[in-house]
Design a protein with these regions (language model features):
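Ribonuclease/tRNase effector modules and their secretory precursors
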Residues: 1-89
Length: 89
């Protein structure tokens, strides 16, 4: 499994944490699904230091400036997103 992704569009270098790798196994997320979300997903900022990349129900939570900073953003966790319930009339 790749744990380092150089030159991710719009982000630069991204490293995948051990926690994120473990969550992928727990949730049954394939490496292909991770790459699709990371490389082609929509980006949502969540405060100054965190952003998400999400595609096809897979969300990658990324720290922009992890400490200690080693020159890459850190994909802190990966998980499946379930659609929210919607009320119908």
């Amino acid at each position: 499994m790749d744990h380092y992704f150089p030159d991710v569009p719009g982000l630069g270098n991204v490293a995948l944490s051990r926690h994120a790798q473990a969550r992928m196994v727990e949730d049954g997320i394939s490496e292909h699904d991770l790459k699709e979300a990371l490389l082609n997903g929509s980006t949502t900022p969540d405060g100054q230091d965190v952003l998400w990349r999400e595609k096809d129900g897979v969300r990658v939570v990324i720290l922009r400036q992890p400490m200690p900073f080693k020159g890459a953003m850190l994909a802190k966790t990966v998980y499946r997103v379930r659609p929210a319930a919607r009320a119908t009339k």
